[in-house]
Each structure stands twice: as structure tokens, then as C-alpha cells.
UniProtKB/Swiss-Prot annotation:
This is Hemagglutinin. Homotrimer of disulfide-linked HA1-HA2. Glycans are attached at N24, N38, N54, N79, N142, N181, N301, N499. A lipid is attached at C555, C562, C565 (S-palmitoyl cysteine). SUPFAM superfamilies: Influenza hemagglutinin (stalk), Viral protein domain. Residues 17-530 are extracellular. The keyword Membrane applies. The gene is HA. GO terms for molecular function: host cell surface receptor binding. Coiled coil: none annotated.
Amino acid sequence: MKTIIALSYIFCQVFAQNLPGNDNSTATLCLGHHAVPNGTLVKTITNDQIEVTNATELVQSSSTGRICDNPHRILDGKNCTLIDALLGDPHCDGFQNEKWDLFVERSKAFSNCYPYDVPDYASLRSLVASSGTLEFFNEGFNWTGVTQNGGSYACKKGPDNSFFSRLNWLYKSESTYPVLNVTMPNNDNFDKLYIWGVHHPSTDKEQTNLYVQASGRVTVSTKRSQQTIIPNVGSRPWVRGLSSRISIYWTIVKPGDVLLINSNGNLIAPRGYFKIRTGKSSIMRSDAPIGTCSSECITPNGSIPNDKPFQNVNKITYGACPKYVKQNTLKLATGMRNVPEKQTRGIFGAIAGFIENGWEGMIDGWYGFRHQNSEGTGQAADLKSTQAAIDQINGKLNRVIEKTNEKFHQIEKEFSEVEGRIQDLEKYVEDTKIDLWSYNAELLVALENQHTIDLTDSEMNKLFEKTRRQLRENAEDMGNGCFKIYHKCDNACIGSIRNGTYDHDVYRDEALNNRFQIKGVELKSGYKDWILWISFAISCFLLCVVLLGFIMWACQKGNIRCNICI
């Protein structure tokens, strides 16, 4: 029996020596790339969904919920609209001579003075907003023969009747209202904005009581323009106890030009001018609170970071902002194609290269080597190819941001009712621009993703070809990203292959000799394990048959006695 056990042990040892990976005269070297268990899906030109190891979101889809007061100068309109602050509504006196980068109008803002309308409200609002200041300068207009500084109970300042502080309500003096003809030259080197108005009484009696004449007229002109307004006497809806109205108009006087005002009644005269400045100031309607923080980009929803090239928070923006697109998400690949590692590598734990799958757990680089030799197994990253890929991918995000960030704000656009067709056309144009930008954004990201994946695949192939050129006939390409090395290759030898100092000639004779000693037929990697198992099973079966035959022979000779008891 001891002899049988000894023979079985010797047989198993011989069999074990023939298993893959146990031949000290060969080694296996595989090349592979980084992989993660769960990658990120991105779009490319050729594939709607391809998994990569890492990706960056390009669409900013949320705001901070507050408007940052830095670096832009924010002026909170509170209860006042910009036009009320411009006219000098008594409850907006705190805004006189204020300056801003962005004027924030609130939904709670209201007028609390004489009822008025501005026929070209949007243009005036935009002009003043872009000027960025309510800086006002009084001028000495000569209104001889009329009473100045009219007021109304609809416009209270404390307990007293008042009026817009930037306007001068003129009405009759005693029983006369002479024809007014006043000029004011612009001798400065900047544009001046004059605000004036026309009063529309609710009844003929109110008209004559204030202006004597049954019908007034106001003409304001410069060398470049002229406006003549005839008051419309008649009742209107009651506002703050009044059914009369004031229409507000405005005139810009260029340097060297002259302002001429001619009227025989109903004139709401200017007290001076606003200095017009050119700049990038703007206005925005928002109820977001103003907070102490820093952000270059502001939307009505609040400030947003501008570290991404696109946003879908709001179409209205101020500052250096990401481009508005319709998509909720656009992901830029910043890693390579992800092929998760298979958890089992055959029944003998063989290693595999990049052709079959990626490698998880590579923390030192994107590309690397795994080896199996007489000293065991090991893994190391290839820093050169990793750095080459990273250098080309780095800066992709910044380049996309540079291509897409708005350098100027997207202002709110308003049109009066009579300009409805213009508004519809403008909306169509704006929607078309957004559709176009959304398409361009998706195409741009898909192109960049395709380039990234092709680039990282190329670096893997370059590393593989570099290794092949070093090994030459000393090794065989196994077809799965691995090389079978036909000479003894310890860890120092493997290291020389990785760092490019491998000397092919040193191992050439040994490799050729080992090639000739290999069996004539070498099975492919997919079937080898199964054949070995079958061979092992047959060998064990034959061993059992031999053992059983020996026992039966011994029983016949009388050397072994077998008793069967029932």
C-alpha cells in the first residue's frame, strides 16, 4: 500500500510540473489599462452610450439660490422699479445718484406717485440700466410766467403733497399760461438724458383750470429729432384717486447739440439731466436674496458657478456665464474606455491583457504591466504612456469653456403691445439660437469624447507595439494582450522590459532552444484548461483502475482476504 501511495504522489508531482505557469523556463507578460467597477456612460459620434472610467458633467443645472454681491456691484431695487427711481418717486429717494453693475428689480416693487405711463418703457429702462448710474445734475431752466413745483395728493412725501423729484409740474400763474420757449445747449463732451412729460387731464374743466387753454401742446426737439405731443383729455381708470395721467418721454442731447422745449400748456418739465455712460451694466427681475459671496455669473434664480461651459438654469444671465442649452446633462469623457475586469481568469487563475478586459485597482497609472514568472506575479504602471494621455486630455474642459462662455450678459427683452409682431419674431430668433447652441453643444461634446477614447486606445496600442518590438522572437503574442516569454525572465528582466532597457540578444539563444522543446501542438487559451482537466480526470480514473486491478489480483493470490458480512 505504501508503494501505491508513493507512486500516486510522484505522478501528481509530475502532472503539476506540466501545468501552465509552473514552468520556470518561461514567463507571461500582459499589458493592460485601468478599469473601474462602474463607469460613466457618455455619447460619442459613433455611439450613443459608451462606458468610460471617468467623465465630467458640463451642464450647470442648479443655482446657489442667492445673488452674490461680489465681484459685481448689485443694487437691490427693493420696493422701487428702475423707472420710479429715475423719475424720483418720493418712496425711492434713497436711490438718487446710485450706481450699479446689476440693478435687481423685485416683484413687490410698486409706484406710489402720480399715475404715469412710458410709451417707450423698455427702451428707456434698458438705456438707464446699461448706463449703470442715476447720477443727476440740475440745470437752471427759465420758466417765466408760470407756476412751478406742482404737487398732488396721490404723491405723498410724509404728510405733504409732492411730485416726482426729477420733474417740474408747470401750471398757470394767476389766469395766464404763456407760450414757453426754452433752450438748453449741451456744451459738455458727453450725452445728456432729459426726462420730460405731458399731462393728460381727466376733464376739460381740469384742463382749463390748470393751463387756461382748452388744448395744450408740447414740442421737444434737438438738431437730430423732434417730438410733438398733443394731450388727450379724458377719464381713465382710477389709480390712487386720480383718473388723469402723465406720459413720460425722454430725449438724448449729444455734445454740441441744443435742447429746445416749446409749449403752451400741459408740460411736465425736466429739472436737469442724467449723465449717460456706456458700459456693461444691466437690469434683472429676480426675487432671489442678495448674499455675501462671489460669483461671476448671475441669473434670476441666483448666482451660478461658471466653471462649466453650459447651463440650463435660466436663459437670462449677467456676467461671464455658461452658454444656455436645453440639455439637462452633457458629460465630457476625461478617462478611457471602461472594460470592467472579469472576476475569474480560468481555473488556474491565469492573467489576461487589455484585449479581454481592463484591470481594476491600478492606482498609479492608466496603463501598465502584469507578469507571471518563477518568482510569482506582479503589477506595475507605465507612467510615460499614462502621462502622454493625461497631457492631451488635460485642458479639454477649459478649452470647451473658452469656446462657449458668454462674455456679455443676455438681457431681458421687452416690447410694447403694438410691437407684438417684433416680439414674436425676436422670440423665434432666440429660440432658434438656443436650439442651435444645444445641437452644437451636443456635437462638440460627442466629438471631444470620440477623440478622448481614440486617444487612450491609441496610447494602449503604442505601448503594446513598443513591447513587441523589444521582445521580438523571444516571445509570442498570445492574442489577448499578453506575451509568452520563452526564456527565464525574473523580476529584474520584467523590469527591463517595462523601462525599455531589455536586451533581446542576451536571451535569444535560450528562447529559441525553449521554443523547440515545446510540444508540436499548443492549444489555444480558451480550451487548454478544459483539456487539462479532462486529462487529469482520465489519469485519476486509470489510477483507480490500476489500483482496483491490483487489489483483485492480490485477492486471487490470497495475499488479501476480503470478508463480506450480512
